[in-house]
UniProtKB/Swiss-Prot annotation:
GO aspect biological process, one term: Gram-negative-bacterium-type cell outer membrane assembly
Protein name according to UniProt: LPS-assembly protein LptD
Coiled-coil segments on the chain, per record: none
A Pfam family it matches: LptD_N
Keywords (A to Z) from UniProt: Cell outer membrane, Membrane, Signal
Family: Belongs to the LptD family.
InterPro entries in alphabetical order: LipoPS_assembly_LptD, LptD, LptD_C, OstA-like_N
Keyword Signal: yes
Oligomeric and partner information: Component of the lipopolysaccharide transport and assembly complex. Interacts with LptE and LptA.
Keyword field contains Hydrolase: no
Protein source organism: Xanthomonas axonopodis pv. citri (strain 306)
Protein's cellular compartments: Cell outer membrane
Job description of the protein: Together with LptE, is involved in the assembly of lipopolysaccharide (LPS) at the surface of the outer membrane.
Length: 813
């Protein structure tokens, strides 16, 4: 009797064929009815994945109210039930012929297993020839939403055919959308299905027609069309992208990406992915012949991949190339010049990690992507860079070393001629083709050089229940080998082998006090955590040292406890200074959550710090304010959790020398019901070199649920200095059990010149099937912090990154 259940997997195979194309995004099913369209059947076994895996080895039990016929032609009548593992088949009547293999199940035919549920009028077939037919089917997917019906299903072995079938994730009483197909062929052995004349309906209106397409019915990938993306923008006009997936092999595939932009023409793109036991990779290329707006060919290539050499070593590479300096602006929708980089980095290297060590050998190169700048804005290329770090405790001591050897190169710089200024009274009125012109006049010839930096240290971390004390001594040696071009570049003195050697001593100490207290009827644990950090570094003249990759750190609370002001090894500031800081927290005793935290600190400079980065050979390194004897700016951080929904934070820096604030930021967040959120922020920064205002911005964003189905989204990002918006977003979202529609209108700064662009984004999400239109998630997730509520709880990036290529030697010890 075990073979009597052979027909049952067929409806499952066909039912999952369309949802197999569903997107990977998390879906909200909260608006769906709590009751399944097909409730579970009485007497059916409970869902059990383990029983589903073993069903072929389990016996079949048959029961019914009455049994008649003969031993070769048994007939079961009334409440017939067949059970095997997690499978259940019920019917009013079941007739069988054990000699011919024929069977007929009639009246209220029901089937259920761990992932699938079905009702039908009749099922018949022959077990010997493995042919089956089921008529008038209604089905439901149990593990994920999805239901539909079919007029009939025919099965011959592993091949089946469904007639006049539908699929939707909507409630059957309100099918907002459904897919209809008069004929679907399914091959379980090959793992694909073929639909003919399929139509996607929204309501009763057909919106997409597929005369023929193949699709997967299991995890095996199949070649075919993916859902399109489309949008509208002032830069590109109507924008349509039709992905075509190519399943080339089990471990590699490709996607063709033809794209039409009404203002530019056809762009041809492709994406190739590969996977093997030791690694994976992905390469993407795009080519636009004869861009209508630029009158030239455009293109890009991006590659990323890795290979695991063994348990300690991994090779990684990331290659980026674009055809011109306008490409990023024209074909990305980020805040170019404001929130995106002016250059692309390509990196290749091998990296190792052990219990007490990290090491690596890599090389990188930079490409300019901002047409308003010349090559002077690019960082130096590292070709190559080798580094090694080691640290290990020895009793009460801890010892370690950081070593790095780098060869730096740089492309020569050529003058960029800006376009003619606008007429009086006009602003940014020039045509798109009136570009900056890159001349052949050399602006600066860069040489090359190599640098060795070694920093051994030894520390003695001591601590108790309410205190810690860590004295540290380090020695830093840095040496260069420069070519004549670089060595004779002002203000360098012509020395081709300059070097620097100096000790670094620090003492880090802190105390911890706490007490129990009560405020407004709530019990708190109040802490007081004073901290002291003394740093001494003798002065060394470093004017003859080039500046390759060194920049001043942005002054912050964390900077109070670093042993250098710089990110790289080209400068090591002299110091005789003491940091005094204190932190106080209020922790709720019932759950340990932090109600309020306050931190403040200041550096006391006992002497002038003579080392600066000013007037270096590298204009891109910028400049900094000299550090004089006295006091640094006060740095204060505060975070206040008003309640479980409302939080506030602030950062403030006040300079006692200028009696002005150097930096101020205020941010507040309110969490609404139904995952809504409101963000408000203000940011201010003063230019310390000329005391002018450098940045003054206000940022307001929200996701406001109007009701369970409708919500509004928006952002207003405004520059108070320029008196103009940087980005404006407005949109609405409509959500239902099975369909979501999002529409956005966006106006944003598209380049460093402050020119604005407009775009319209519309996306349809057929839950459980796919989405088409322009992806709005990426835009909203960037613009509205907390658009995905889980983003609020992600750990922010820190300087103690585990990526060895990003390891900062100045954070050792």
């Amino acid at each position: 009797m075990r073979r009597a259940l052979r027909l049952l997997p067929l409806p499952l195979s066909i039912a999952i064929c369309l949802p197999a194309m569903a997107a990977d995004k998390p879906l909200n099913w909260g608006l769906c009815p709590a009751v399944d369209p097909l409730p579970g059947f009485d007497g059916a076994p409970a869902a059990d994945p383990k029983a589903a895996e073993m069903r072929q080895q389990l016996p079949t039990d048959i029961e019914g109210d009455q049994l008649s016929g003969t031993s070769t032609t048994p007939q079961y009548q009334g409440n017939v039930a067949l059970k095997r593992g997690d499978q259940f088949l019920g019917a009013d009547n079941l007739r069988m012929d054990t000699e011919t293999g024929n069977y007929i199940a009639e009246g209220n035919v029901r089937y259920q297993d761990t992932s699938f549920r079905m009702v039908a009028d009749r099922a018949e077939g022959n077990q010997d020839t493995d042919t089956h037919k089921v008529t008038n089917i209604q089905y439901q997917l149990v593990e994920r939403r999805g239901n539909g019906d079919a007029e009939s299903v025919d099965l011959q072995g592993q091949v089946g055919q469904m007639h006049r079938s539908t699929y939707t994730t909507c409630d059957p009483s309100q099918p907002i959308w459904r897919v209809r197909a008069p004929e679907i062929d399914v091959d379980n052995e090959e793992g694909f299905g073929t639909a003919r004349n399929a139509v996607l309906q929204i309501g009763k209106v057909p919106v997409l027609y597929f005369p023929w397409f193949k699709f997967p019915i299991d995890d095996r990938r199949q070649t075919g069309l993916l859902f399109p993306q489309f949008g509208l923008s002032g830069r590109n006009g109507f924008d349509y992208l039709q992905p075509i997936y190519l399943n080339l092999a089990p471990n590699y595939d490709a996607t063709l990406l033809p794209r039409y932009m009404s203002k530019r023409g056809f762009m041809f793109g492709t994406e190739f992915r590969y996977l093997y036991e030791g690694g994976r990779g992905e390469v993407t290329g795009n080519y636009l012949p004869n861009d209508k707006l630029r009158d030239k060919d455009r293109g890009s290539v991006f590659y990323s991949g890795y290979h695991n050499v063994n348990t300690h070593w991994q090779a990684r590479s990331s290659i980026s190339w674009v055809s011109d300096t306008r490409y990023v602006e024209d074909f990305t929708s980020r805040l170019n010049g404001m929130g995106s980089a002016s250059s692309l980095q390509s990196t290749v290297g091998i990296y190792g990690t052990g219990e007490t060590w990290t090491a690596g050998l890599m090389a990188d190169r930079w490409q300019l992507t901002d047409y308003t700048l010349d090559e002077q804005a690019l960082p130096y290329n590292r070709q190559p860079r080798a580094y090694f770090t080691w640290e290990k405790p020895f009793g009460i001591f801890e010892a370690g070393v950081y070593a790095e050897a780098v060869r730096f190169t740089h492309d020569d710089s050529y003058f960029v001629q800006p376009p003619s200024p606008s007429a009086p009274g006009e602003t940014n009125n020039r045509d798109d083709n009136d570009e900056y012109v890159r001349t052949n006049i050399r602006n600066k010839e860069y040489g090359s050089g190599a640098r060795l930096d070694v920093k051994p240290y030894i520390s003695m971390p001591l601590s108790g229940a309410a205190w810690f004390l860590t004295p540290t001594v380090a020695w830093r040696y840095t040496a260069y080998q420069l070519d004549s071009t670089l060595a004779n570049t002002a203000p360098l003195t012509g020395n081709r082998t300059p070097s620097r050697s100096l000790p670094i001593a620090s003492l880090d100490a802190g105390l911890y006090f706490d007490r129990e207290t009560s405020l407004f009827g709530t019990n708190y644990l109040n802490t007081l955590e004073p901290r002291m950090y003394y740093l001494y570094v003798p002065y060394r003249d470093q004017d003859d040292l080039p500046v390759f990759d060194t920049r001043p750190f942005t002054f912050s609370y964390g900077q109070l406890f670093r042993d250098t002001r710089y990110t790289g090894a080209d400068r090591q500031n002299d110091a005789n200074q003491l940091t005094l800081a204190v932190t106080s927290r209020w922790l709720r005793q019932d759950d340990g959550r932090e109600k309020l935290s306050l931190s403040a600190g200041q550096i006391l400079y006992f002497s002038d710090s003579l080392v600066t980065i000013n007037n270096s050979n590298n204009s891109a390194a910028g400049s900094e304010q000299t550090v004089e004897q006295g006091k640094s700016a006060w740095v204060a951080d505060a975070n206040y959790m008003i309640n479980d929904r409302w939080s506030m934070g602030a950062t403030y820096q006040w300079n006692p020398n200028s009696r002005k604030e150097d930096l101020a930021s205020l941010r507040t967040r309110y969490l609404l019901n139904n995952d809504g959120i409101i963000n408000l922020a203000y940011r201010y920064r003063r230019n310390l070199t000329d005391n002018s205002d450098q940045l003054k911005q206000a940022d307001f964003s929200f996701l406001y649920p109007i009701n369970p189905s409708w919500s509004a989204v928006g952002r207003y990002y405004y520059s108070l200095l320029d008196r103009k918006p940087l980005e404006i977003i407005g949109g609405v979202q409509w959500d239902s059990c099975c369909l979501a529609v999002r529409g956005l209108v966006r106006r944003f700064v598209r380049n460093r010149d402050g020119e604005m662009d407009n775009s319209i984004q519309i996306e349809f999400v057929l839950k459980g099937l796919s989405s088409f239109g322009q992806n709005t998630d990426r835009t909203l997730r960037r613009a509205i912090l907390g658009y995905y509520r889980d983003d609020l709880y992600l750990v922010p990036p820190s300087n103690t990154t585990t990526n060895p290529d990003d390891y900062d030697p100045n954070l050792i010890p």
